[in-house]
UniProtKB/Swiss-Prot annotation:
The gene is guaAA. The active site is at C79, H166, E168. HAMAP family: GMP_synthase_A. Its EC number is 6.3.5.2. Keywords: ATP-binding, Glutamine amidotransferase, GMP biosynthesis, Ligase, Nucleotide-binding, Purine biosynthesis. One of its GO terms (cellular component) is cytosol. It comes from Sulfolobus acidocaldarius (strain ATCC 33909 / DSM 639 / JCM 8929 / NBRC 15157 / NCIMB 11770). The lineage of its organism: Archaea, Thermoproteota, Thermoprotei, Sulfolobales, Sulfolobaceae. It comes from the Archaea. This is GMP synthase [glutamine-hydrolyzing] subunit A. The keyword Cell inner membrane does not apply.
Amino acid sequence: MKVAVIYFGGQYNHLIVKDLKYLGLEAVAITPDKSVEELKEFDSVVFGGGPYSVINELDKMGFAPDYVKSLNVPKLGICLGHQLIAKVLGGEVRKANKPEYGLTTVNIVDEDTILRGLKPSIKAWESHNDEVVRPPSGFRILASSENAKVQAMVNNDNSIFGVQFHPEVKHTEKGIEVFKNFIKICRK
């Protein structure tokens, strides 16, 4: 399976590629200046984190909004990628009332997909100023924290996922399980 990891300049994006390669996938870091057509060779897309805000810097994310809307493959958004998916598909993203940095308790409310085996909660690495406050129509919330209601979400057909936390960072408990679950979903 070939996975495009969309690189927005985030400090942890290389860890996503490393984890996916460790799990036996062909993972390639891609900058968002590639056309949608150039990404059609990939079986899935992971949108990494980065320094931008989807609130007022969507224009700095190249073709990434088009990837969200146009690529008909499973998608996983992490941190900024989670916010990007929400914003592009009609959800709401705002400046966080209380930004989260470091380890945070993430409460799993629905573990039937990407969070399988993680209930009731995990300690997860966070690094964000913005947050999804309302998922797009057709999405449900999978996890929350004390400060962020939408820590994880999925669309109704279980093909588009977002997590606010960083499963690729070693401090996140069972972070690799998030990637394993995503791979299982992609292979269905």
